[in-house]
């Protein structure tokens, strides 16, 4: 990764989710042969993500900085972090762009999709080791990463100050969980890979919950609505204006 920004480094972290299942079986005694039993089982899911880490100028591990999580699309899956620099903030950083916040850009393994619980655990681990302003954590993603942004925001809406899914979609239940959280949605009107209706459905679900999402539709854009979105400095200004109170 010699052609990568010196501030953007590749790291690997295992995100482990421990799920406890407890089954309590209570017997209604009919005779002495019926007893009360308790069964407990503990299972562990492990997700392993390589990711790019960008630390802004002035980061010294003491002063807390905002954090942006970027989720790439399906075409950048694999085990080569250079793929992650193809689009979005990692591409801009690679080309010399400086941001006033931390950026982490994980890579999804081949053949799978973003898992919200794995990403949530990744953030837990990262935040525990870095000076992060927990009131200013943001998530954005494109295509498959747009779906991941909706899913992660729905899983843990209290974590994020704002979300920006691009040409994505998802489960309207996630939109209901996100509710009034600041969200800026982007989509191309001529997208034949993920139709505009996917974002429209999620935006409408937010509105039904009292949300006031921003919704930018690029009338001439196909699936690539992310280049224009991520090249827009107003997106990052908007992110930084959002804070959990």
Label each region the model flagged.
Residues 2-15:
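Bacterial N-terminal signal peptides that target proteins for export
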Residues 67, 74-118:
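Active-site machinery of serine-nucleophile hydrolases
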Residues 58-63, 111-143, 157:
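Gly/Ser-rich "nucleophile elbow"/oxyanion-hole loop immediately N-terminal to the catalytic nucleophile
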Residues 27-67, 140-142, 147, 152, ...:
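A domain-start/cap signature at the N-terminus of enzymes
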Residues 186, 192-245:
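C-terminal catalytic histidine-bearing segment of alpha/beta-hydrolase fold enzymes
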Residues 71-72, 187:
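The conserved beta1-alpha1 loop
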Residues 135-179:
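Primarily recognizes the serine-hydrolase "nucleophile elbow" in alpha/beta-hydrolase
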